[in-house]
Amino acid sequence: MSDRKYSAAKIAPRIDAFLRAVTKSAGFRLSFEVADAQSPHPEFENPEVVVRFSGPDVELVLNNRAELLLALEHLTMEMLGMPPEDHTRLCFDANDYRLLRMEELRLSAAAAADKVRHTAVPFTFNPMTSRERRIVHLALRDESGVRSESTGVGSHRQVVVYPEGAPSESQPAPLGPAGPQYSTRRRRR
C-alpha cells in the first residue's frame, strides 16, 4: 500500500487547466507534463508529483535562479490548496534545474564544512528557499566537526555553518564568573 497523498492522476487536470490559462495569458511558449515523480535523491527531496516544463521560452522560467519557475510552483500549490507541510510533495522543473541545483548545494555544503573545519570561523550562505536550506542541512548532517542552523526571517533566511561547539549568533556566549565583562564575545557598538 502506498503512502502517497498526491498523484498525477488526481491533480493533473487541475494543474493543467491552471497552467494553460497562466501561460497563455502571459504569452509564454511553454509546454509541460505532469507526472508521478521518481526522485534520484530521495534522502534530499522526494516529491510525489513533478511538473516538467519545456519549449522555446523555458529559459525565461529559469532566469534569476528559477524565480518564475518557483513562483508558478507556489501559485499552483495555492490553487490546489496544499498546506505548507505538503509543499515538498509537488515539484516544478525545467532542463533538470532542480537536480543540478541540488548537486550545487551539496557541493557548496561540503566546501563550507571544510572551510569551517580549517578556519573555525562560521560560514553564512546567501538566503535561499526552505527546500534549498533543507538540502544544505541534510548534506551537512554527516559532516564531522560542524553543525548548521537557519537564521533570519522570511525570504532572508539563510544557513549558517558553525564549528562544532561554537555558540550560535543568536545565542549569548557563556558569561564568566563576574558577569558580562568576562564574556568570550566582543560587544557590538
Where do the language-model regions lie?
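RNA-contacting regions in translation and RNA-metabolism proteins
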Residues: 1-189
